[in-house]
Amino acid sequence: MGPGPRCAPGDPGWMLGALALMVAASGRFAFAFNLDTRFLVVKEAVNPGSLFGYSVALHRQTERQQRYLLLAGAPRDLSVADGYTNRTGAVYLCPLTALKDDCERMDISEKSDPDHHIIEDMWLGVTVASQGPAGRVLVCAHRYTQVLWSGMEDQRRMVGKCYVRGNDLQLDPGDDWQTYHNEMCNSNTDYLQTGMCQLGTSGGFTQNTVYFGAPGAYNWKGNSYMIQRKDWDLSEYSYKGSEDQGNLYIGYTVQVGSAVLHPTYITVVAGAPRHQHMGAVFLLSQESGGDLKRKQVLEGTQVGAYFGSAIALADLNNDGWQDLLVGAPYYFERKEEVGGAVYVFMNQAGTSFPDQPSLLLHGPSRSAFGISIASIGDINQDGFQDIAVGAPFEGLGKVYIYHSSSGGLLRQPQQIVHGDKLGLPGLSTFGYSLSGKMDVDDNSYPDLLVGSLSDHIVLLRARPVINILQRTLVARPAVLDPSLCTPTSCVQVELCFAYNQSAGNPSYRRNITLAYTLEADRDRRPPRLRFARSQSAVFHGFLSMPETHCQTLELLLMDNVRDKLRPIVIAMNYSLPLRMPDRLKLGMRSLDAYPVLNQAQALENHTEVHFQKECGPDNKCDSNLQMRAAFVSEQLQPLSRLQYSRDTKKLFLSINVTNTPSRERAGEDAHEALLTLEVPPALLLSSVRPSGTCQANETILCELGNPFKRNQRMELLIAFEVIGVTLHTRDLKAQLQLSTSSHQDNLQPMTLILQVDYTLQASLSLMTHRLQSFFGGTVMGEAGMKTVEDVGSPLKYEFQVSPVGDGLAALGTLVLGLEWPYEVTNGKWLLYPTEIIIHSNESWPCQPPGNLVNPLNLILSDPGDKPHSPQRRRRQLDPGGDQGSPPVTLAAAKKAKSETVLTCASGRARCVWLECPIPDTSNVTNVTVKARVWNSTFIEDYRDFDRVRVDGWATLFLRTSIPTINMENKTTWFSVDIDSELVEELPAEIELWLVLVAVSAGLLLLGLIIILLWKCGFFKRARTRALYEAKRQKAEMKSQPSETERLTDDY
């Protein structure tokens, strides 16, 4: 039967206009199953635009002739020419032929009588239903109108009308079913009663009942009617609900069946798509007195979804109770791109249905998914009822086929029939109406008739379904010893097939050919086996049946197989290749030659081949890999902390791996034993002992053995270059993971954490450790001093700090501290600091806390020497410790007669602590400390000493709150020798004549001495012969000259 009208009662164009706005756009895909789409029976309208296919039904005629017919309603078809009417609608009966235009109009004679009834545009064929094999046919026209006269004024009542015809689609006056008027609505009432009831909007048959929907009754509240016949008795039933509101459309669709709310009694299921604007389904039961009583109402969940516009009953899980499917074609979810829904309510053993659906099926956006629903029988003959759902506005229309199981309806469709892939010109809105549950080609599989709004109907026939039996796959031997392989075979595989038809037809013995594919070691690359015939790991073959057929294949072992623990999986999958026509073929060609494989069966099989291993009788290796690891020094001593400095180059990791038995584990061979190490970027793999064991990529992978045998031990020593440790590095983490293809489930990763102590390397140097200065003159008090020159002679120390390397930033600060001899024990000034300047990229003064530098705020100026008289001069001293030798003074040229030393350690001087932070820079930093000798103190307290030495200390240290960063303090001493001021007398000038006399006397004396030496022969030289003779005589006397003589022999 058809799903009922898709227009609002009383307005034939409302729904058509609304549906015209809906355009489908979906690309869903499902595996094609057993509804054939190549050999079709297609029928087209005689009169285009008649909505031929608006409603459809499959019918089996058994009277007068045996045949199957396709019934199609065309509610907008032209009327039979009578001179009074133009368009009444019609119902067509179509034979199962290859022709598209051989449908005949069903003879329903209704003469036009405008004074009593109006048949113009009565939508004959809005509902078409068949009672089943050898049953009758129901045809309705829900816009059939009665005319009432009140004086000269006529009143029209659109009560609707239904016609029952015999099995041969002819009127039999002797059949009470056909002659009964079926007028359930009273045309003498107005729309508030049943005067506009629109009977026949929906309707159908059971074996002893005919039922109708009348959604326009009672101000379009709606009603459902049922006529039941038992023997010669006839009973009429209608629903008289307590609802007082209109526009519910109860009866828009109606289904009747038993085993719904009672095992044997009938239950009427009526849709009301406008109930509370969200739709509802009423479940009504028979009561005495002809009433239908409401038992349960299932309500929709979304406004405007038209929940209840299509309904179907089917026992989905084979529990003996019919379940309920409800369509809501205008349901939508914008974000999810959903358009249309089908609610599935599972029967609770006849007591009721749950308020919430057990399953909610969705269609794509704007598809009107669920506008038609049909129970189509068991099309694949798996023992469970199947369902078809139309989505006419998805593309050119689609029909979704859902299978069911013991758990109910399956969520995913098993097949989607695409209207645009059928190759039918002019086809659209495919799936607008559906009818099934009848096998029209006698192949034991029910078929499906699909209607549309485009004047086409299409018969989809079910292909036979093949169950593959005895799909065995056996490998011999099951445990492979590679030493027993021959050049032609290592493993032998045997596969066998047999089949039957799912419908259980024993006469179906077609010769079919299965295509199969065998793949050795499917999950591994490269594979470990190959087929001898194909020289690869994949083999394609064919097997012909109907009898059980087997085939045997030989396989060979690949060279250099490493993995001998995991079994070799030999997988098989198979299919049924058929040469289907490339184009559409119309007609009733037998589909027995085009079976399909049962998609519910697994279309693959597999077997395993194990390697012979020393792993006990179960051939299962239970290893017991254990590991100990630690960071060690070059002397292989464990490290608890890494004392890192810039001189640190290497770090070592010691790893010990064993595979020994324990109480819990057998300690059998560990195949493909691997060690994976993940180390931080600061560590770079340098070397491994034993060499060649490990390889470094993103991680370090060490091959321990294949297999790593029982009771085997192994020690690895891995050396890393330390390249990336910074001041921010707190620790070094290494993660070690043992793995094996043998069975061992307790291999947990090990994490080693080595704390890092970062030792900074900085240096402190002093340009001149020991300065020289002086004191003398007169005593001057603090009040009389204006400039630093008034204090005394100047001093300047130049400290140099080398770069640390990595910048400290916020981690800490380098500080130069000075233990400065500030005053003597009696509180008098000693060395007065005037200025501290730091030189790096820029220069700036250092101001230690406590106002210790130039506390008297004396005026700073460059020191200079004052002129002295020609007879007396002060010793010139270098106050800044310039490069080169200090000038020689009288005090420095001779040892001081008396000297004293002032230090803070001895208690003879008091020191203060001066601190200057060193900038965080990579350049060398110079710190200049300027001071003045407090002249007055030395004149008053140390005039009795020729020299006073004052000592102090400078320390470079790190100040940080990070415990892992440290630096060894750098300390140096500085000193100054302060001499008392001395005056040296210059010698008196000598007369010139005395000089001339002295020179002349000297020359005369020299001349006398030369004459005397000449007279004595001092200037005469010896002869050469005498020299040689004497030398030769000497050589003769001493046969072996001494070493000294040898060295001096030529002189």
Curated annotation (Swiss-Prot):
FG-GAP repeats: 38-103, 110-171, 185-235, 236-292, 293-354, 356-411, 415-477
Gene Ontology MF, one: protein heterodimerization activity
Biological process terms in GO annotation: cell adhesion mediated by integrin; cell-cell adhesion; cell-matrix adhesion; integrin-mediated signaling pathway; leukocyte migration; positive regulation of protein localization to plasma membrane
Entry superkingdom: Eukaryota
Sequence positions that bind Ca(2+) 3: D439, D441, N443, Y445, D447
UniProt keyword Secreted, yes or no: no
Entry binding sites for Ca(2+) 2: D378, N380, D382, D386
Region (Disordered): 860-888
Binding site for Ca(2+) 1: D315, N317, D319, D323
Cytoplasmic side of membrane: 1020-1051
GO cellular component term of the entry, any: external side of plasma membrane
Post-translational modification remark: Isoform 1, but not isoform 2, is phosphorylated on serine residues.
InterPro entries, per database record: FG-GAP, Int_alpha_beta-p, Integrin_alpha, Integrin_alpha_C_CS, Integrin_alpha_Ig-like_1, Integrin_alpha_Ig-like_2, Integrin_alpha_Ig-like_3, Integrin_alpha_N
Cystine residue pairs: C94-C103, C140-C162, C185-C197, C485-C490, C496-C550, C615-C621, C694-C702, C846-C904, C911-C916
UniProt xrefs under SUPFAM superfamilies: Integrin alpha N-terminal domain, Integrin domains
Description of how the protein assembles with itself and partners: Heterodimer of an alpha and a beta subunit. The alpha subunit is composed of a heavy and a light chain linked by a disulfide bond. Alpha-3 associates with beta-1. Interacts with HPS5. Interacts with FAP (seprase); the interaction occurs at the cell surface of invadopodia membrane in a collagen-dependent manner.
Family of this protein: Belongs to the integrin alpha chain family.
Protein task: Integrin alpha-3/beta-1 is a receptor for fibronectin, laminin, collagen, epiligrin, thrombospondin and CSPG4. Integrin alpha-3/beta-1 provides a docking site for FAP (seprase) at invadopodia plasma membranes in a collagen-dependent manner and hence may participate in the adhesion, formation of invadopodia and matrix degradation processes, promoting cell invasion. Alpha-3/beta-1 may mediate with LGALS3 the stimulation by CSPG4 of endothelial cells migration.
Designated name of the protein: Integrin alpha-3
